[in-house]
Amino acid sequence: MRFSIFSSLLNARLNLLSKVIVNSSSLPLLNNFLFNIKDGVLIITASDSENSIVTRVELVNNDADFSFAVENKTILESLKTLQEQVLNFVIDENNVLKIEYANGHFNIPVITEHNYPTPKSVGDNAVTLTIAGELLYNNICRSLFAVANDDLRPIMNGICFNQTEDFMDIVASDGHVLVRNRLFSFKTATPDSFILPHKPALLLKTLLQKCKSEVVIRYDNYFGTLSFGDYTMTFRLIEGRYPNYNGVIPTNSPNVAEVNRKSLLGVVKRVLPFSSNSNLVKVELKPSEMKLNAEDFDFNMTASETLSCSYNGDTMNIGFKGVVFASMLNVLDVDSIYIKMSDAARAAIVSPTVQPEDEDCILLIMPMLVND
C-alpha cells in the first residue's frame, strides 16, 4: 500500500487538525489521525469524541484505497522540519509505515485494523445556514473572550446564534461582559437558535483565518456540522435555552464618551500593571478628557494617565476590571468607539462609532465598585 503527497500541504493540514486532539482521551485510538485513501484523495480525520475535523487532500499518486491510524505527535514531529518535497508513504505487511523523503526515511507503526469513531451526522430535520467565512470569523473573534467557563451554568459556555425574522444575533456572555453582534443580512421565516461550545468556536477561529468562501452550517437538536472548502467540522451543541440577553442591555445611557480605541487601549495596558489583584482601573470622565487611574496600596504603586476624548454627560467616576476592559478594546478592529453610561453602578456599553456594513455590534461591561 503506497501513496505520495506534498510535504508542506500535509504538514499544514495535520497541524490544524491536531488542535482538536486531546491526548488524555479515554479512547487511545483518538490520539491518532485517521488516514483514509479513496479515489486519489487523502481524507484525514481528527477527533476528541465530541468534536471532529475532516479534511480532504489531493494525492500525487496512490496504488489502492485503504485506511490506517497513526499517532499524532510522532508524525507531526517527523514532518515539521522537512523542506517542500514529495513524500512517499509505504505500509508493509507488518503494519509499519515508511515515510520516504529526499535524504532518509521514518518508520512508524500504524493501526490498519481499527474501529475509529465515525463523526456524528445531523438528522434529516437539520436547519441549514450559509454565511461568509470572513464574516463568521470576525464575529467569532469578537465573541470568544466573553464566553463563560462555568460548570454550574453550562449554557453560558458557548456562543449563541439566534436567528429571527429581521436579523441574526451572535452572542456571548459570562455574566460580567456581553457581546452582541447583530447581522441584518440574515433573516428567517422560522426563528431558531443554537449554541456553539467554546472549543469548536476556538477551532473555527484557527480554521477560518484565511477562508474566503461561504460556510455552510447544518444543525439539529444535538449536533452541528460546518463545511467550507476542504474542511468539515462536526461538534456537539450545548443543549438548552440561552438567557434573554437583550433584557440586560441598558436602553437609556445619556453619558457618552467618544475616544480613539488604540489610544485608550494603550493607556489601559500602561496603568494596569499598577492595579491591585482586583485589576480595578478607575476612569474619570470630564468634558474633553478621560483620566485612568490604577493603584495597589499594598505595594505602594500608583499610575495615572489622561487622554483627550469627546464627552457629553455628567462628571463621572466609574471602575472597570482592567484585564476585561483591555480584552474588550482589543477585539474591536475600529479607529474610535463610544462608551455609553447611565451611572457608575450600571453596565456600560462599548460600540464602534462606525458600525460594519449591515451589522450592529455592542459590548457590555459591568462596572466595579469605586471608593472615592
Specify the residue positions occupied by each region the protein language model found:
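Structural preference for solvent-exposed beta-strand-turn elements
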Residues: 1-372
